[in-house]
């Protein structure tokens, strides 16, 4: 299954980018994980959300399953994430798109159109850290599915 992460922002600090790449490489046997960075907009919040959301929508395909990382989304455990991904894999979807909006999030139209809204935590993190946490959690979910000792909670 292909997983594409659409992120608003820039590449960022090398140490974060390197760690994200490490988890991305580790996942390649199970998922084809790719990261697409889209430019952020330095306008007032409402206009920035609209322009950034339009850029995200332009990258979506009609049959994509879409998850939005959003502080108002549902929080789940790592084993629940593993199960959710396995269910998608078993249903034969071609591509899961995980969306990380800009500093002000995404517009309501995009938020309301996604398949699922997911919150990594009640805490707010910098975008680069969100990418790293997401990459690690996708890897952890895969390891849970494989019965690996990586996850031992």
Q: What is each PLM-predicted segment?
A:
Residues 32, 36-96:
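S-adenosyl-L-methionine/SAH cofactor-binding core of RNA-modifying enzymes
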Residues 108-152:
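Structured adenosyl-cofactor binding patch, chiefly the S-adenosyl-L-methionine
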Residues 11, 71-74, 102-105:
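Short glycine-rich anion-binding loops that position phosphate/pyrophosphate groups of nucleotides
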Residues 5, 67, 101, 134:
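Conserved RecA-like P-loop NTPase ATPase core
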Residues 6-8, 36, 99:
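Short hydrophobic segments within beta-strands
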Residues 1-27:
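N-terminal beta1-alpha1 ligand-phosphate binding loop
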Residues 86-124:
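A mid-sequence interfacial segment
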Residues 17, 21-24, 50-53, 108:
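Short, surface-exposed alpha-helical segments at coil->helix boundaries
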């Amino acid at each position: 299954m292909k997983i594409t992460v659409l992120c608003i922002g820039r590449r960022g600090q090398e140490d974060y980018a390197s760690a994200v790449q490490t988890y991305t490489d580790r996942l390649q046997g199970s998922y084809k994980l790719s990261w697409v960075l889209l430019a952020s907009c330095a306008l007032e919040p409402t206009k920035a959300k609209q322009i950034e959301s339009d850029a995200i929508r332009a990258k979506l395909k009609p049959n994509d399953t879409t998850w939005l990382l959003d502080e108002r989304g549902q929080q789940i455990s790592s084993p629940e994430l593993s199960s959710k991904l396995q269910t998608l894999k078993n249903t034969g979807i071609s591509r899961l798109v995980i969306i990380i909006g800009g500093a002000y999030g995404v517009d309501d139209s995009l938020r309301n159109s996604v398949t699922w809204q997911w919150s990594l935590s009640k805490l707010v993190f910098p975008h680069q850290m969100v990418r790293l946490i997401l990459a690690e959690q996708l890897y952890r979910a895969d390891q849970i599915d494989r019965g690996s000792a990586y996850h031992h909670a």
